[in-house]
Amino acid sequence: MNNSRYVLALDPSGAYKEGSGTTGWCLYDIEKQKILKIGSLYAGDYSCQFHYWDAHIDLIDSMEGYHPDVVIEDYLLYGDRAEAQVNSRLETPQLLGIIKYEVWKRGLFIYIQTAAQVKTRWNNNILIHKNVIQKEGLNHTIAGTKVSDHILDSVRHAIHYSTYNSKYKRR
């Protein structure tokens, strides 16, 4: 059931062998409409693909006290990018499958959103206007911390889910 007060949003990249995968994540409090935690997982920090993938499960387990709904950006193969994926191992969809299964095993609610659902609706200008992020020079920050595009995307997913899909009733 998708009625948790908290949402863990993930913008996953499974690319371990095919580049430097980076997963951005955000823990969001729906009641206070506030970002509690943000971070990234970098494939290059792990000795093998399985350790990188396992770090995602460790992240989910570290949020156990919040019992969050988990929102994940889906992977879609768009026609204009399909040729670039020829002979690809499609590591990100593999990682998505692992995350979905592990979230289900833990009894957490999982919700999948596309990038297209959130990128326009919650663009940087809107997030700045709503005081979710700040612009400092060429960088975007959250509470004074410079954030990557992957973290920004996870924030977009958390806010979109909170606004349109969560069944949590704010007091």
Please place each PLM-identified region on the residue numbering.
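Phosphate- and other anionic-substrate recognition elements at nucleic-acid/protein interfaces
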Residues: 1-171
